[in-house]
């Protein structure tokens, strides 16, 4: 069984060595989709939505929201950010996938 939750955060970055306009500092409103997979526990839930919210906030959002991604990642592409998010959350919850939207029409997805 899979359940999911959507989160949002704002951050700035630039892409070192990139030849296009993204070489300059700019910002995005990111949408983060987290999907957890597992069996229902005795309480009838795979994971409590509020518990999932707390884990994502403490593990990801508190560290990335309103930050300059270049101070956290050497090369803050959506792919590198999504990979880091997946790895960090996968230590704490049974992830199925992470999808990171960079704006309204661009995304990267990592699946287990």
Language-model region placement:
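Charge-rich, low-complexity N-terminal segments
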Residues: 1-112
């Amino acid at each position: 069984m899979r359940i999911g939750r959507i989160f949002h955060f704002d951050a700035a970055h630039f892409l070192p060595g990139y030849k296009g306009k993204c070489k300059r500092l700019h910002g995005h409103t990111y949408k983060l989709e987290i999907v957890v997979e597992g069996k229902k526990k005795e309480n009838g839930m795979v994971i409590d939505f509020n518990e999932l919210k707390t884990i994502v906030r403490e593990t990801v959002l508190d560290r990335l929201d309103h930050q300059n991604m270049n101070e956290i990642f050497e090369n803050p592409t959506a792919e590198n950010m999504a990979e880091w998010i997946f790895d960090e959350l996968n230590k704490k919850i049974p992830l199925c996938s992470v999808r990171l939207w960079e704006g309204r029409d661009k995304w990267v997805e990592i699946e287990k």
